[in-house]
């Protein structure tokens, strides 16, 4: 389903009624979780830029050869490179497609979009947030001023100008975004899917409410008693969640707030490699770091113990000091 297609409230309610929202254990393996994402689905990705990216699940989707996905995220980083370069996504919907704050716009994205085999659909950052929020609210659109008069307007015919019935002012109506599945990485959750997020939540709460199903990857699975001791930290409730995967360092080489910072040596080497040659550089990276390892633990070993320990030291120090 194209990312611009808006579903009716009746359809959303019908889909919601079909979901199993019972309090049950939902723990599955990384391989099983990736199997829940089917070819051609619209996939919402949690986190932002290089923060709490569900990299382990993206890694597994590439390994399983998923195809023709339309992926949406508030800001895309090297995850977008891998989704395009690994042949998983045909379209990425976002507000900024960069390899990270330090390295600027993605040359991998530019290569594929200019070649015409992939699509990059650009919205403003606020528009992405309001699209997920509209999806979570079950309304077909929300009004914003962002993008009015900008160069994005001619590129986004899906957004409609509208005269406010109360003030007469021009507003822009952005269509709801209801992904088939959301993949979100969190610091901790219980086996039922009650997820707690430390630090910035980005658009993850609205994304979880908007999606037809939710897969959580988590640094660790904790007891329900621990979740209940800090109920104010629970941002995504169990009734939204369909599967839970425990994946330590599941956002690597990106960061997970309070636990580890980005693994910069690995990131810098990656960027240098793919920027030198977006096709062959990406192929070499995928062969070594995605298709080569037997499992996620082996991928982490390729990053190296020294870098992981240093990223963990920095992450915990910044959180606690």
Say what each PLM segment does.
Residues 1-321:
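Conserved alpha/beta enzyme-core scaffold
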């Amino acid at each position: 389903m194209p990312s611009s297609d808006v579903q009716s409230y009746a359809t959303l309610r019908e889909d919601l009624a079909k979901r199993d929202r019972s309090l049950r254990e939902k723990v599955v393996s990384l391989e099983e979780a990736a199997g829940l994402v089917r070819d051609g689905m619209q996939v919402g990705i949690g986190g932002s830029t290089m923060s709490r990216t569900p990299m382990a699940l993206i890694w597994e989707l590439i390994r399983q050869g998923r195809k023709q996905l339309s992926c949406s995220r508030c800001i895309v980083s090297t995850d977008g490179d891998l989704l395009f370069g690994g042949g998983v996504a045909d379209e990425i919907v976002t507000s900024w497609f960069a390899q990270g704050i330090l390295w600027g716009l993605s040359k991998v994205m530019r290569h594929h979009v200019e070649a015409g085999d992939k699509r990059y659909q650009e919205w403003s950052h606020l528009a992405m947030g309001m699209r997920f929020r509209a999806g979570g609210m079950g309304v077909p659109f929300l009004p914003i001023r962002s993008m009015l008069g900008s160069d994005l307007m001619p590129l986004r015919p899906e957004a409609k100008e509208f005269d406010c019935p109360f003030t007469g002012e021009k507003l822009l109506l952005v269509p709801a975004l209801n992904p088939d599945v959301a993949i979100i990485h969190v610091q901790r959750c219980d086996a039922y899917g009650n997820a707690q997020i430390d630090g910035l939540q980005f658009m993850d709460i609205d994304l979880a409410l908007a999606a037809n199903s939710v897969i959580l990857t988590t640094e660790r699975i904790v007891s329900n008693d621990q979740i209940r001791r800090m109920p104010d930290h629970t941002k995504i409730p169990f009734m939204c969640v369909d599967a839970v995967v425990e994946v330590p360092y599941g956002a690597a080489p990106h960061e997970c707030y309070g636990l580890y910072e980005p693994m910069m040596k690995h990131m810098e080497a990656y960027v240098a490699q793919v920027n030198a040659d977006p096709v062959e550089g990406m192929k070499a990276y995928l062969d070594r770091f995605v298709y080569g390892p037997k499992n996620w633990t082996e991928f982490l070993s390729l990053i190296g113990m020294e870098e992981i320990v240093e990223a963990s030291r920095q992450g915990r120090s910044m959180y606690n000091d």
